[in-house]
Amino acid sequence: AGGIADGRGMAAAFMLGAEGIQMGTRFVASKESIVHENYKNQIIKAKDIDSVVTGMSTGHPVRSLRNQMTREYLKLEKENADFMELEKLTLGSLRKAVQDGDTVNGTLMAGQIAGLIRREQTCREIIEETVQQAQECIAAQGQHK
């Protein structure tokens, strides 16, 4: 799910037959989002290679921004740590990021598109900009037929 950061992604999804899109990370970094400003700032500063998937060994993969916690988690996974050891590491880590703003030990859930987000915007601005850009992309496709 997700993987959409802007109108280009929305247009591509629609041109492939989708009837809607899901945007998560983009709205986590919005002005209305209740996550801690440190979390939002990490998303805004992220580059395209700054996310990583943890939890593959447990069957519950989660994409997050790289930090000390994800490095430790991946190390433990590589060492075949059991579920309880991994669970112990992550217990409360989302709260640490969302409420406390702990960007070192918290889980900073974010999609691969984090690297495309450059500023904090209102939800209204995100939606209007995304729809306008999608309409422009779709209209431009019609001119290339």
Stretches found by the model and what they are:
Residues A5-K145:
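Conserved active-site-proximal phosphate/metal-binding subdomains
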Residues A1-G3:
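Glycine- and other small-residue-rich loops at beta-strand/loop junctions that grip anionic moieties
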